From Swiss-Prot:
This protein's encoding gene: KAR2
Activity regulation, free text: The chaperone activity is regulated by ATP-induced allosteric coupling of the nucleotide-binding (NBD) and substrate-binding (SBD) domains. In the ADP-bound and nucleotide-free (apo) states, the two domains have little interaction. In contrast, in the ATP-bound state the two domains are tightly coupled, which results in drastically accelerated kinetics in both binding and release of polypeptide substrates. J domain-containing co-chaperones stimulate the ATPase activity and are required for efficient substrate recognition.
Catalytic reaction equation(s): ATP + H2O = ADP + phosphate + H(+)
Identification of the protein by name: Endoplasmic reticulum chaperone BiP
Position of sequence motif Prevents secretion from ER: 664-667
Gene3D superfamilies assigned to the protein according to its UniProt record, in alphabetical order: 1.20.1270.10, 3.30.30.30, 3.30.420.40, Actin, Chain A, domain 4, Substrate Binding Domain Of DNAk, Chain A, domain 1
Entries under Pfam families matching the protein: HSP70
Region described as Nucleotide-binding (NBD): spans on this chain: 132-286
Cellular localization per UniProt: Endoplasmic reticulum lumen
Feature: compositional bias, Acidic residues: 650-667
Region: Substrate-binding (SBD), residue numbers: 406-506
GO terms assigned for molecular function: ATP binding; ATP hydrolysis activity; ATP-dependent protein folding chaperone; protein-transporting ATPase activity; unfolded protein binding
GO biological process per UniProt: ERAD pathway; fungal-type cell wall beta-glucan biosynthetic process; IRE1-mediated unfolded protein response; karyogamy involved in conjugation with cellular fusion; post-translational protein targeting to membrane, translocation; SRP-dependent cotranslational protein targeting to membrane, translocation
Region entry Disordered, spans: 637-667
């Protein structure tokens, strides 16, 4: 029996508040001048957001649709990969190949209860691969599997691209946020996703802590005790922080990694399934396309009910040609979800208890995450805090990315953030199994990080040559009730009576919440260690390298496809523009022969496009454009006094959505 026995504690606790004294000495060791611009990314369950700090100002960046938040969706069609708005917009037509809610699977095992619960409601297939959940979809007609890290990497890659488009240069480093209650495996997996996206994740920051930075930047006078209540699309966190003179110190954190707006949507979906079955006798609970439509409309209805008392849910030809038409009131929505709303108050009570504070000690509570717009959520919280109103000074959708960008600015040496110090905590107790299956804590929950703690243990039987170190996280007294992070053995212990050998076990928890454990035989000096990685299913370096290569291949394919689509659109817009103006504004100005020449050329081009819309290459679209412009230009130049009859040169940077760019009657 390779159990180990607790002998006596050794106080080698590196007190985390040391960071306050020398917050920037550590930074000097980092090669900050090589980071370039470091971006802040809020990788959300339903939406993601990216921000950057430049010249002391923090900017939330808009995507190509002009939206400051981007759906955390990835879709595969017969021709292409879509990410963000484009992926979400086609889900009803392509539900089994559109991936969302991937954050609910990342870093977890396939047999995890929450994973099993979630996959029942997901329209795409989730299968078991080596004990991990992976997504199975059709890519260009073939079955492919993707890990949650790969899908998250695609979303992070999209955020990276948005930042690069804004900055006009490559981005290689980022700060990424995670729920405060994410465990070690989920944090490691998120870092791996960043690597797959081509990003070096300098720091993993807890979401409520990042939001607190956004809230507290301008509150530098007296000490503030604040609670950040972060209710997003799929996760829920509460953190209690003290803020004073630029020091953000987390006192306690709690939450639920499987509670958020998606759960509220699902309650609406279930209600609509029930009423539709009652009215029409049709059960759509296994119809993926119908469920995708319901999910889309449920989210819209939920959003509408934050500002109005009732809303209509209308879906034409919902199933078998039958329309769906229902009214949902705010009162009914609140009734459906009241148990979940009330459930969010438990972690609030928990952080107050852990920090040894009372409600009256809280100066402010800050609402983060889109779900905090729900009036009933705000009402319950205000009632809990005896009528105190929530702080409305920050945008709940953008606060986390804003705070992440500020932390990115701290790490990259941006101006204006020199005095900011972030002291976060670990969310779960970390310890090892000792005699009798007892969980012996080394680092208690809500300990400031980074931190290091050592303790002396010994053997449980005479002449024991080996001890097995099993590392757990959790709050239960028995190790079997907690989450096993990893295990390793220390061998070659010289024969000795039980209790004599001294085995020093050291836990080192870094600023990202990632753990390294070592065990040293004090007698021989022999040591073994583990950084908690592959024992709990983290990707190997080979797997990460393969996924990086595939991500680059996808990005290259996306770029080629984007160029092709731009060339196709340019040609189609030009042909339609010629046709419309020949039949409209220029009809009276052109000679019949010229009019016929232009119409024939435009119609021939449009017919060719119809026949070759998907199969033609970028070069063929460009050649057709050149041929059409050579036909059109001599005719139009006669109208406007053109001299040489040569084809015009078109600027690729022009706005190609404007049909009049190529052929305009008002030059």
């Amino acid at each position: 029996m390779n159990a180990i026995k607790r002998l006596l504690p050794v106080s080698l606790f590196l007190y985390a508040l040391f960071v306050v004294l020398l917050p920037f000495q550590a930074r000097a060791k980092d090669d900050v001048e090589n980071y370039g611009t470091v971006i802040g990314i809020d990788l959300g369950t339903t939406y993601s957001c990216v921000a950057v700090m430049k010249n002391g100002k923090t900017e939330i960046l808009a995507n190509e649709q002009g939206n400051r938040i981007t759906p955390s969706y990835v879709a595969f069609t017969d021709d292409e990969r879509l990410i963000g708005d484009a992926a979400k917009n086609q889900i009803a037509a392509n539900p089994t190949n559109t991936i969302f809610d991937i954050k609910r699977l990342i870093g977890l095992k396939f047999n995890d209860r929450s994973v099993q619960r979630d996959i029942k409601h997901l329209p795409f297939k989730v299968v078991d691969k080596d004990g991990k959940p992976v997504v199975q979809v059709k890519v260009k007609g073939e079955d492919r599997v993707f890990t949650p890290e790969e899908i998250s990497g695609m979303i992070l890659g999209k955020m990276k691209q948005i930042a690069e488009d804004y900055l006009g240069k490559k981005v290689t480093h980022a700060v990424v946020t995670v729920p405060a209650y994410f465990n070690d495996a989920q944090r490691q997996a998120t870092k791996d996703a960043g690597t797959i996206a081509g990003l070096n994740v300098l720091r993993i920051v807890n979401e409520p802590t990042a939001a607190a930075i956004a809230y507290g930047l301008d509150k530098s006078d007296k000490e503030h005790q604040i609670i950040v209540y972060d209710l997003g699309g799929g996760t829920f966190d509460v953190s209690l922080l003290s803020i004073e003179n630029g020091v953000f110190e987390v006192q306690a954190t709690s939450g639920d990694t499987h509670l958020g707006g998606e759960d509220f949507d699902y309650k609406i979906v279930r209600q609509l399934i029930k009423t539709f079955k009652k009215k029409h006798g049709i059960d759509v609970s296994d119809n993926e396309k119908a469920l995708a439509k319901l999910k889309r409309e449920a989210e819209k209805a939920k959003r509408a009910l934050s500002s109005q008392m009732s809303t209509r849910i209308e879906i034409d030809s919902f199933v078998d040609g039958i329309d769906l038409s229902e009214t949902l009131t705010r009162a009914k929505f609140e009734e459906l979800n009241l148990d979940l709303f009330k459930k969010t108050l438990k972690p609030v009570e928990k952080v107050l208890e852990d920090a040894g504070l009372e409600k009256k000690d809280i100066d402010d509570f800050v609402l983060v995450g889109g779900s905090t717009r729900i009036p009933k959520v705000q009402q319950l919280l205000e009632s809990f805090f005896n009528g105190k109103k929530a702080s409305k000074g920050i945008n709940p959708d953008e606060a986390v990315a804003y705070g992440a960008a500020v932390q990115a600015g701290v790490l990259s040496g941006e101006e204006g953030v020199e005095d900011i110090v972030l002291l976060d905590v670990n969310a779960l107790t970390l310890g090892i199994e000792t005699t009798g299956g007892v969980m012996t804590p080394l680092i208690k929950r809500n300990t400031a990080i980074p931190t290091k703690k050592s303790q002396i243990f010994s053997t449980a039987v005479d002449n024991q040559p080996t001890v097995q170190i099993k590392v757990y996280e959790g709050e239960r007294a028995m190790s079997k009730d907690n989450n096993l992070l990893g295990k390793f053995e220390l061998t070659g212990i010289p024969p000795a009576p039980r209790g004599i050998p001294q085995i020093e076990v050291t836990f080192a928890l870094d600023a990202n919440g990632i753990l390294k454990v070592s065990a040293t035989d004090k007698g021989t000096g022999k040591s073994e260690s583990i950084t908690i990685t592959n024992d709990k299913g983290r990707l190997t370096q080979d797997e990460i390298d393969r996924m990086v290569e595939e991500a680059e291949k996808f990005a290259s394919e996306d770029a080629v496809l984007r160029t092709k689509i731009e060339a196709r659109n340019k040609l189609e817009n030009y042909a339609h523009s010629i046709k419309n103006q020949v039949e409209g504004d220029l009809a009276e100005k052109l000679e019949e022969e010229d009019k016929e020449t232009l119409l024939d050329a435009a119609n021939d081009t449009l017919e060719w496009l119809e026949d070759n819309f998907d199969s033609a290459t970028t070069e063929e679209f460009e050649e057709k454009f050149e041929a059409l412009s050579k036909t059109a230009y001599p005719i139009t130049s006669k109208l406007y006094g053109g001299a040489d009859g040569s084809a015009p040169v078109y600027d690729d940077d022009e706005d190609e959505d404007d049909d009049t760019d190529y052929f305009d009657d008002e030059l």
